[in-house]
A protein has these predicted regions:
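Flexible, glycine-rich beta-alpha linker
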Residues: 21-45, 71-75
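Short-chain dehydrogenase/reductase
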Residues: 1-6, 42-50, 79-80, 84, ...
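Active-site Tyr-X1-5-Lys
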Residues: 1-32, 51-58
Length: 182
């Protein structure tokens, strides 16, 4: 996945050089959350925040893959990005290009990482319950931590994240609860 994205960025860069073409490539870090009743639906779910919220709402046991990573609490840390922040990054990228920006690749993230255990604790806090959880083995090839350096997005496009992990969890809970009510 990462290699194919890098290949496309390289093609864009070569094309831009050859044909005097400006572009932006946005690198999203862990899209999450929902907006006005629109959310992320996969079956089976593949992203951790919808999984955690779903398990909390159904009372099913949550399995966290690995608690022996080189992080503060032993669980993976990820930089989660609210879908509205991603939308605003697209607008900033368009405005940047329309205003004469030269283009390039930009990291789009929340600017800080949250561990899986931190996300679980936030879901528990907002739902006022305790999630039945267990720790399983690590998944192969999963890095301990990812975090977006969004300095270039701010410096060149004037973009920064507006939503926190608390906002992301709140919106994901509201979205999944709306599905239950239907």
């Amino acid at each position: 996945y990462g290699k194919s994205k890098l290949m496309i960025e390289n093609v864009l860069e070569d094309y831009a050089t050859a044909y005097d073409f400006n572009y932006t490539a946005l690198r999203y870090f862990n899209a999450a959350g929902s907006f006005e009743g629109l959310g992320y639906q996969l079956d089976p779910k593949e992203h951790i925040i919808p999984i955690i919220v779903g398990k909390a709402l159904t009372g099913e046991k949550l399995t966290i893959n690995g608690n022996d990573y080189e992080t503060a609490d032993g669980t993976c840390e990820r930089d989660y990005t609210h879908v509205v922040d991603i939308a605003s990054a697209h607008m900033a990228a368009l405005n940047y290009l329309f205003d004469g920006g030269t283009g390039g690749s930009f990291n789009i993230g929340g600017g800080s990482s949250s561990s899986i255990d931190t996300v679980v604790a936030e879901v528990e806090k907002q739902l006022e319950l305790t999630i039945d959880k267990e720790y399983g083995p690590r998944r192969d090839g999963v890095p301990a931590k990812t975090s977006a350096n969004i300095a270039k997005a701010w410096d060149e496009m004037g973009w920064e994240s507006s939503f926190t992990i608390q906002d992301i969890v709140r919106d994901e809970i509201a979205y999944q609860q709306s599905l239950i009510k239907k």
